[in-house]
Amino acid sequence: MKALITGASSGLGRDMATVLSEMGYDIIAVARREDKLKELQSELKTDVEIICCDVTDNDQCIKLAKRASEVDIFINNAGFGVFGNFDVTDLDTELRMLDTNVRALHILTKLVSNTFKERGYGHILNVASLAAFFPGPMFGAYYATKSYVLRISQAVAEELRQAKSSVKISVLCPGPVHTEFGDVANVNFGNGTEKATKHLVLTSMDVAKYAIRKMLKGKEIIIPGAIMKIAVFLRRILPDKTLAKIVYLIQSKKCIKK
């Protein structure tokens, strides 16, 4: 058994690699930071191949997708966010985020699902976010990218069902998680709202364990945490305008790092 994971150098990707390794899976760990990948390689018990790859490069993405024939599970985890009002966030950084969160995932999902379908089996796990269900003022472009991840995953999963394929696609939609995400997004999550939100933030390992368990059971939309499931339910009954105001109130309490 073998799994390939992008964004495997830290956080959720690293922990999912650890969980799968403990279950006996060999790992192909993909990220840009070779030093972090080597650390992971030295820690895991099963065989670990490391690939230094920038998924914003289309050619590297296409080359990476060719490894799908070797694996049972392909996890699209690479991604990051940009925090701040839309009129002041850096355009180049946002475009790089779109390339990472949307373009790369689109390429890999398309090519890997085709390989899996021709072969007759395989499971893709795309990492979205609870943000996929909501409008996201002060995090607008990031929220929009995760909506794309959710909807393309649902659409392709249904196409595979209609084709009577054994290939599965799951999409992980976690709420706040303790990872490097806040550092990359240049925001302190919890500042100003720490007392109200600290019990909502899950550990990366808890989310990784839950995600892998549910994925292997064939769950399509995976939402860790009871409170996060309630949030998605409320999203169904509240108008988007109201939700946008609520999200803005939450986001405006976050402190941009200096």
Show where each model-derived region lies.
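Substrate-binding pocket helix/loop in short-chain dehydrogenase/reductase
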Residues: 85-98
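Active-site helix of classical SDR
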Residues: 109, 145
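The beta1-alpha1 cofactor-binding region of Rossmann-like NAD(H)/NADP(H)-dependent oxidoreductases
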Residues: 52-63, 91
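SDR active-site lid
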Residues: 159-226, 241
